[in-house]
């Protein structure tokens, strides 16, 4: 069974909320402002590793009070990239992760809104989830003892 996330837009508060699907009731929703730009480097991961949620295959930053790095990246209102075609988005985000020079575009914002700014639930191999992972998160996954795959870990 794949780790599953439910991402919900709260238009009243202009906040994107990420909730683990099937987590214990003690699991808290993660939310952050959509208007804030992402930091240039990943934030420190808090001591709380999220183990109380009994979920593996999630980046350690998924349990940060600021929310996951990759989703915070894709939820920024203003996106910058090095390409001019939507089908190159995953490659573009990976290049941005490596620190290559970006330039402003207009299509990228609409593309991300179409993928993210709706209620959705993800599990397994899915393009939108891959886009989030390629968005720049450098944190280790929460899993043990063997290496895990973000898309297939239970």
Curated annotation (Swiss-Prot):
It is found in: Host cytoplasm; Host nucleus; Host mitochondrion. GO terms for cellular component: host cell mitochondrion; host cell nucleus. Keywords: Activation of host NF-kappa-B by virus, Activator, Apoptosis, Host cytoplasm, Host G2/M cell cycle arrest by virus, Host mitochondrion, Host nucleus, Host-virus interaction, Modulation of host cell cycle by virus, Transcription, Transcription regulation. A fraction may be phosphorylated in insect cells and HepG2 cells, a human hepatoblastoma cell line. Phosphorylated in vitro by host protein kinase C or mitogen-activated protein kinase. N-acetylated in insect cells. The keyword Cytoplasm does not apply. Residues 68-117 are annotated as: Mitochondrial targeting sequence. It comes from the Viruses. One of its GO terms (biological process) is symbiont-mediated activation of host NF-kappaB cascade. Its main location: host cell. May form homodimer. May interact with host CEBPA, CFLAR, CREB1, DDB1, E4F1, HBXIP, HSPD1/HSP60, NFKBIA, POLR2E and SMAD4. Interacts with host SMC5-SMC6 complex and induces its degradation. Interacts with host TRPC4AP; leading to prevent ubiquitination of TRPC4AP. Interacts with host PLSCR1; this interaction promotes ubiquitination and degradation of HBx and impairs HBx-mediated cell proliferation. Belongs to the orthohepadnavirus protein X family. Multifunctional protein that plays a role in silencing host antiviral defenses and promoting viral transcription. Does not seem to be essential for HBV infection. May be directly involved in development of cirrhosis and liver cancer (hepatocellular carcinoma). Most of cytosolic activities involve modulation of cytosolic calcium. The effect on apoptosis is controversial depending on the cell types in which the studies have been conducted. May induce apoptosis by localizing in mitochondria and causing loss of mitochondrial membrane potential. This is Protein X. The lineage of its organism: Viruses, Riboviria, Pararnavirae, Artverviricota, Revtraviricetes. The gene is X.
